From Swiss-Prot:
It catalyses: 2 reduced [2Fe-2S]-[ferredoxin] + NADP(+) + H(+) = 2 oxidized [2Fe-2S]-[ferredoxin] + NADPH. FAD binds at D33, Q41, Y46, V84, F115, D276, T316. This is Ferredoxin--NADP reductase. Gene3D superfamilies: FAD/NAD(P)-binding domain. Its EC number is 1.18.1.2. The lineage of its organism: Bacteria, Bacillati, Bacillota, Bacilli, Lactobacillales. It comes from Lactobacillus johnsonii (strain CNCM I-12250 / La1 / NCC 533).
Length: 318
């Protein structure tokens, strides 16, 4: 059985930073992820997204952020395509993972957990489905085309800004107000090749000569419809997350998120959690906040495992 000071579940941006920070403090660490590559949701869904709320970067592509974080983990063990299914506690308080790994502490950084995009609630055909997308992993698909983006959150607005560089874009949202950054909305309004269609919902889809006739219904007006011809549809309705595995492990959840203390500890001994998997009063889902939570958690784990050691906080130490 392999032995480690710390196991991290989740190799998204926050999990990767936690692994590098743990290594900085000398913790023997192993990181698991169910996917076959690092980066989590960013890498799977929007690697080309310009992320603008990371300190020291006015803007950085999702895939570049993941790449830089991954470089920092070169001295830690990473086990991909491994979905952790079982954790148990030994008599000596160590944690046993999948009967193969014995660790002194566990850090959960699984984000939304197993997630699936919320699908477009309209009847479609296989031919139509070929033109309906739920991520922007391959932006070249949309180049020089007319694209309808459905949704009003940050992802929809970010995708619209990115695609506007090479495509004509419709953004369809059921409300007049968007849920994303006001700066993004203002920027989109200034672009001649972007049209914001509010308050509308998609009503029907028809395929005609390999183009989609998108029928939109104006919210609150029973007989008000418009039709737009597009080549591709990009759906940004958010995701359904599944954290049932955490419940099986006995971890306390609140609204499907992990409840943590000020030290990022869960209700279980030596089990901590960080990032978008957790909740506490005032928390907002931001990557940069997750980085800070990783530092708090690793510092707490160090004090838990090695109380006799004097912690060095590198950023401000002389």
């Amino acid at each position: 059985m392999e032995k480690y000071d710390l196991a991290i579940i989740g190799a998204g941006p926050v999990g990767l930073f936690a692994a590098s920070f743990a290594n900085l403090h000398g913790l023997k660490t192993i990181t698991f992820d169910a996917l076959d590559e690092v980066g989590g949701q960013i890498n799977m869904l929007y690697p080309q997204k310009d992320i603008k709320d990371i300190p020291a970067f006015s803007s950085i592509k999702g895939k570049e952020l993941v790449s830089r974080l991954f470089e920092q983990t070169e001295n830690t063990k990473l086990t991909l395509s491994h979905k952790v299914k079982k954790i148990s506690f030994s008599t000596g308080e160590d944690i046993i993972i999948d009967d193969d790994y014995q660790v002194k502490s566990l850090l959960i950084a699984t984000g939304l957990g197993a997630f699936k995009p919320k699908t477009l609630p309209l009847s479609t055909t296989p031919e139509l489905q070929a033109h309906i997308h739920y991520s922007m992993q391959h932006p070249e698909i949309f180049s020089n085309k007319k694209v309808a983006i459905l949704g009003g959150g940050d992802s929809a607005l970010d995708w619209a800004l990115e695609l506007s560089k090479t495509s004509d874009v419709y953004v369809v949202h059921r409300r007049n107000e968007f849920r994303g950054l006001e700066s993004s909305v203002s920027q989109l309004k200034s672009l001649k090749n972007v049209e914001l269609l509010t308050p509308y919902l998609p009503k029907e889809l028809h395929l005609n000569n390999n183009r989609i006739e998108l029928v939109l219904h104006r919210v609150g007006a029973s007989h008000d419809f418009i039709t737009k011809d597009v080549d591709e549809i990009l759906v940004a309705y958010g995701f359904k997350s599944d954290n049932r595995q955490l419940r099986k492990w006995g971890i306390e959840l609140e609204n499907n998120l992990i409840s943590v203390s000020q030290t990022m500890q869960t209700n279980l001994p030596h089990v901590y959690a960080i990032g978008d998997a957790i909740t506490y009063p005032g928390r907002v889902p931001m990557i940069a906040l997750g980085f800070g939570e990783a530092q708090i958690a690793i510092s707490s784990i160090m004090q838990d495992l090695f109380p006799e050691k004097t912690m060095t906080f590198h950023s401000t130490s002389i």
